[in-house]
């Protein structure tokens, strides 16, 4: 199981939102690069970066910052937010991003998403962001009318290499994870699934861990909880590592 610390970029700073609302942001670091370095030093094995300006505006806004983050780290980076054409996808991969997270484009332009998956095999995943069971797009402000059950089969057929599932109502609220929804998705999916939204404490990691042994769940993104200290990255990684060689993990 991998824990992905989140660095969300808005107006050049590292922030966290509540339930994806752009006007409810908390600045946690003036420099996203410094925040990224701090998570690597704390033991992060992957970094999860989101260009929030790109997600809301529909165009890549933070390419220079993302490039600087990738150059500063030895660990791989996955990136989402504002990737809505092939040129932007290619530019971010050339900048050092290991894999891309596609949301709006995957739901609204299936042919282009499939082309992107073919062009960059194994490096393009999909973000499924749900509120009340329905998937949202365009920075979580538009209701697509789709659900996980209706959207996932086509996205897998298109070539999605992994899935990130965000429970919007729990994102940034530190209220715990929606284990039932995650388990449902992780049993449907044939590619790795990453949980996001509400991962707030070591107890949440402990609730999710059994699913990594039984389903396609492979990790969890956490942001505000790591910044505010309700989840300690070193402690969580140590807890996971202690179970790698136990009988239940064999």
From Swiss-Prot:
<keyword id="KW-0028">Amino-acid biosynthesis</keyword>
<dbReference type="GO" id="GO:0000105">
    <property type="term" value="P:L-histidine biosynthetic process"/>
</dbReference>
<dbReference type="GO" id="GO:0005737">
    <property type="term" value="C:cytoplasm"/>
</dbReference>
<comment type="pathway">
    <text>Amino-acid biosynthesis; L-histidine biosynthesis; L-histidine from 5-phospho-alpha-D-ribose 1-diphosphate: step 4/9.</text>
</comment>
<dbReference type="InterPro" id="IPR013785">
    <property type="entry name" value="Aldolase_TIM"/>
</dbReference>
<protein>
    <recommendedName>
        <fullName>1-(5-phosphoribosyl)-5-[(5-phosphoribosylamino)methylideneamino] imidazole-4-carboxamide isomerase</fullName>
        <ecNumber>5.3.1.16</ecNumber>
    </recommendedName>
</protein>
<feature type="active site" description="Proton acceptor">
    <location>
        <position position="8"/>
    </location>
</feature>
<dbReference type="InterPro" id="IPR044524">
    <property type="entry name" value="Isoase_HisA-like"/>
</dbReference>
<dbReference type="InterPro" id="IPR023016">
    <property type="entry name" value="Isoase_HisA-like_bact"/>
</dbReference>
<feature type="active site" description="Proton donor">
    <location>
        <position position="129"/>
    </location>
</feature>
<dbReference type="InterPro" id="IPR006062">
    <property type="entry name" value="His_biosynth"/>
</dbReference>
<keyword id="KW-0963">Cytoplasm</keyword>
<dbReference type="InterPro" id="IPR011060">
    <property type="entry name" value="RibuloseP-bd_barrel"/>
</dbReference>
<dbReference type="GO" id="GO:0000162">
    <property type="term" value="P:L-tryptophan biosynthetic process"/>
</dbReference>
<keyword id="KW-0368">Histidine biosynthesis</keyword>
<dbReference type="GO" id="GO:0003949">
    <property type="term" value="F:1-(5-phosphoribosyl)-5-[(5-phosphoribosylamino)methylideneamino]imidazole-4-carboxamide isomerase activity"/>
</dbReference>
<comment type="similarity">
    <text>Belongs to the HisA/HisF family.</text>
</comment>
<dbReference type="Pfam" id="PF00977">
    <property type="entry name" value="His_biosynth"/>
</dbReference>
<keyword id="KW-0413">Isomerase</keyword>
<dbReference type="InterPro" id="IPR006063">
    <property type="entry name" value="HisA_bact_arch"/>
</dbReference>
């Amino acid at each position: 199981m991998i824990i992905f610390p989140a660095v969300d970029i808005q107006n050049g700073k590292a922030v966290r939102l509540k339930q994806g609302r752009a006007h409810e942001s908390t600045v946690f670091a003036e420099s996203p690069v410094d925040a990224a370095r701090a998570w690597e030093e704390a033991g992060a094995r992957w970094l999860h970066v989101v260009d929030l300006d790109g997600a809301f505006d529909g165009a890549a806004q933070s390419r220079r910052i993302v490039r600087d983050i990738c150059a500063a780290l030895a660990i791989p980076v996955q990136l989402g937010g504002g990737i809505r054409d092939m040129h932007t996808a290619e530019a971010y991969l050339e900048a050092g991003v290991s894999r891309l997270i596609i949301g709006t484009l995957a739901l609204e332009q299936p042919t282009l998403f499939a082309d992107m998956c073919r062009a960059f095999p194994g490096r393009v995943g999909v973000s499924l962001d749900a509120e009340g069971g329905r998937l949202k797009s365009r920075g979580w402000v538009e209701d697509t009318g789709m659900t996980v059950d209706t959207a996932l089969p086509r996205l897998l057929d298109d070539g999605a290499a992994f899935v990130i599932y965000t429970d919007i109502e729990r994102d940034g609220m530190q209220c715990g994870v929606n284990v039932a929804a995650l388990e449902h998705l992780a049993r449907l999916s044939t590619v790795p699934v990453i949980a996001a939204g509400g991962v707030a404490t070591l107890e949440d990691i402990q609730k999710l861990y059994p699913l990594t042994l039984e389903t396609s769940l492979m990790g969890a993104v956490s942001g505000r909880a790591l910044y505010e200290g309700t989840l300690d990255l070193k402690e969580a990684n140590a807890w996971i590592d202690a179970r790698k060689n136990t009988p239940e993990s064999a």
